[in-house]
């Protein structure tokens, strides 16, 4: 799964993948548009937790003025 949100100056991306051990990982990447600065954070979650966490993050992005691009 890949989701991307943007505001006028910032971006926020979520990747959900399976790692080499078979665990689900949720990686969040964020930063400024046109800027090399940014950061990322990785979380290991169960399948049930992934859906809830993605929805929680999407709700936060919308509340903060981001628009979903992908």
Task: Kindly give the residue locations of the regions a language model identified.
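Generic alpha-helical secondary structure signal
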Residues: 6, 15-16, 48, 70
């Amino acid at each position: 799964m890949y989701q991307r949100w943007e505001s006028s100056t910032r971006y926020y991306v979520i990747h959900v993948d399976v790692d080499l051990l078979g665990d689900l990982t949720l990686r969040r990447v964020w930063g400024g548009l046109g800027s090399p600065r940014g950061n990322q954070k990785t979380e290991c979650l169960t399948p049930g937790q992934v859906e809830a966490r993605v929805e929680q993050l999407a709700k936060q992005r919308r509340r903060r003025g981001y628009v979903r691009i992908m």
